[in-house]
Amino acid sequence: MSRKVTLTVPVDIVVRDRDVHVLALVKKRSGASSHGVSASIRSFADELDVSLDTVRRALASCEEAGYLTVRANRMKNGGQLENTYCVTKSGDGLIEAARRAGLIS
């Protein structure tokens, strides 16, 4: 007979500093909302004082690693709106680990 169990296993992972900061900003902006935050890449770049490409790379890296989901938003006429970014449970875990390590406040 098999049963499902949940195990928490400490694993060392390597993440870029920029990824952690961008992920933490998404979490901060979304607050308690489980729906995430709709924001422009430029607004993230301005707040973190980094380039647009740096934010794009960080968002893509976080999405690929499963720390973040990205949903494209469109107007009725097909025009592009700001994407919606939502931090996943594993992203929350990464943010907490970064806080404990003193990387972010």
Description of each model-found segment:
Residues 1-47, 54, 60-69, 76-82, ...:
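Short recognition helix of helix-turn-helix/winged-helix DNA-binding domains
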Residues 89-105:
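Short, amphipathic alpha-helical interaction segments positioned at domain boundaries
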Residues 68, 72-73, 102-104:
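Assembly/interface hotspot detector across virion components, adhesins/toxins, and nucleic-acid enzymes
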